[in-house]
Amino acid sequence: MKDHPITIGFDDAAFNLKSKVRNTHLIGVVCQGIRMVNVVQADIEIDGNDATEKLIGLVKQNEEHVQYILTHTITFGGFNFIDLERIFNEVKKPIIAVNDREVNIEAVSNALIK
């Protein structure tokens, strides 16, 4: 691994499920080591199915430089899941999804029922 690898990390913007707004932002931050070098964003549907496609597009804007992809979980905008295998196959970059806490299966089940 290089001394200062170039990574792109993704997370979604906050949103309110009770609002009539149906989109939120998918935000990517490109860093070289600890230095931020670029920020990219795309709108994604809340509980939609476009996060994978949008994430791939954002990576491709920087693919010449980016060496690794990091994501905060595998869901964005509620239940808009990303397909890690498809992302890897299309951009040929290692991708790591990070959870900062244990998933509450009961809360997920309740949200899906609603």
What are the language-model segments listed below?
Residues K2-P5, E64-V66, K92-K93:
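Short coil/turn connectors at secondary-structure junctions
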Residues K2-S19:
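Two-metal-ion RNase H-like nuclease active-site motif
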Residues G9, G28-V30, A97:
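Structural beta-sheet core signal
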Residues A14-N16, T73-I82, R101-N104:
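Gly/Ser/Thr-rich loops at beta-strand to alpha-helix junctions
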Residues V21-G77:
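A glycine-rich, hydrophobic loop/mini-helix early in the fold
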Residues T52, I56, F81-F88:
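Generic internal hydrophobic packing segments that stabilize the cores of diverse globular domains
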Residues D83-K114:
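Long, charge-dense
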